[in-house]
Amino acid sequence: TRELTKVLREHGVMLGRIEFDKESDGKNEESGKVDEELPTAVYEGVNYVDRVSCKEIIHYLPDGTSTRSSAHSSFFIPHSSLKKVVLVDCGVKANIIRCLLRRGVEVIRVPWNYDFNGLEFDGLFISNGPGDPDTCDAAVQNIRKAMKNEKLPIFGICMGNQLLSKAGGAKIYKLKYG
């Protein structure tokens, strides 16, 4: 990591990929296709969030159970006394979901571009993720709609914070070192 730090210090942020196994065939687990375009020198204009976000709605309960539903079908959330948090998946880390569940809330994980505003929920969490926030206009529009509810708690982390800022009217630009 010391050598990598030196390169990044000299040249700024770079896209890259970590491979865990030299025998890896380079295939994307979901599609089975070889993902040869990563890493690429292109950052601006490429929607990396779309590549890593879930493609369906996933409803997690604190007891460890979960159900899945197509993002294109109607989604019914059973009534319960637990608080419900919609998690906009921009590339969420599994530990974030575990941390929310440990706090006793239901988590409704939706794709980055899903219009969650028709759901009944108590809080909105916009996750971390890779890439350029300027490629996520659908998420920004949905977040902007949610922001009209002044009593709704909204939290964004990393990419989620940038999308929340854009929804509020901020301009986002990439710094040389991240």
Task: State what each model feature region is.
Residues 1-72, 81-114, 133, 141:
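RNA-binding accessory domains that recognize and position tRNA/RNA substrates
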Residues 105-106, 121-124:
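Active-site regions of enzymes building and remodeling cell-envelope glycoconjugates
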Residues 114-120:
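Short amphipathic alpha-helix with an adjacent loop that forms part of the alpha/beta core around
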Residues 121, 128-178:
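Cysteine-nucleophile active-site neighborhood
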Residues 86-90, 126, 157:
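Active-site-adjacent beta-strand anchor residues
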Residues 75-76:
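Aromatic (phenylalanine/tyrosine) cluster motif
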